[in-house]
Amino acid sequence: MSWLEKILPKSKITTPRRHNIPEGVWTKCSACEQVLYRAELERNLEVCPKCDHHMRISARARLESFLDEQGRTEIGAELEPQDVLKFKDSKRYKDRLSAAQKETGEKDALVVMKGTLKGVPVVACSFEFSFIGGSMSSVVGARFVRAVEESIKEGRGLVCFSTSGGARMQEALFSLMQMAKTSAALDRLSKAGLPYISVLTDPTMGGVSASLAMLGDINVGEPKALIGFAGPRVIEQTVREKLPEGFQRSEFLLEKGAIDLIIDRREMRNRLASLLAKMLNTHVIEE
């Protein structure tokens, strides 16, 4: 110890107290990497308030924010997937289903509700991407057909929010059959003179994009959503060419005429209510 240390008063070294912040309070935008307050992000419908990047939102949260609060009823909730093929790859299909159900709280990858949209009668469907990549299974097809039948029965418009990797390989031909099944149901809806608005969100690929997602009377994309059949990496490897900038993004598809509109998620409720009111020859109830 030096002579200076002997004459100077001893100071206590204190370490700052650690505050226990619960997990999940903060999150990071996957586009701009800004740290965001989780509650604020949820109020903003999972759209980054800094850069407007549209993050993925759960099927149930989407429908609950889209439809009027009063009078919402779920359709086809009792339908549950079955492992009829006893399929097994690196894991048993039965185990994949159990894990997905535990993670999402849903029985399968499509949630269907009927209700009103600013007073306009509607049936709305939303894919849950966290459930095995939003893949189309027999239950997804059955629920979608139920949605169409309910629309025809009660004269309601139909809206579907797609986000999917395509057909569910663990169900083989049972899954592929849903492409024809859902397309045939939409033909019946069209013959009944009722509108179908398809909203393609990030990502909408494979058998879903090749069937129900692209059959809307009006096809809407969310900003910068990846939309296509095969993914861009697969296409590049096949054609051995560099793809154009923004290829398969909703802005590219709008420019080429593959979709009709791009609508910000925060404006979706008002814009679609206005469109459906015109198509059903009714009026919107202003809030």
From Swiss-Prot:
The keyword Nucleotidyltransferase does not apply. GO terms for biological process: fatty acid biosynthetic process; malonyl-CoA biosynthetic process. Binds 1 zinc ion per subunit. Transmembrane segments: none annotated. Its cofactor is Zn(2+). NCBIfam families: accD (TIGR00515). This is Acetyl-coenzyme A carboxylase carboxyl transferase subunit beta. It comes from Aeromonas hydrophila subsp. hydrophila (strain ATCC 7966 / DSM 30187 / BCRC 13018 / CCUG 14551 / JCM 1027 / KCTC 2358 / NCIMB 9240 / NCTC 8049). The gene is accD.
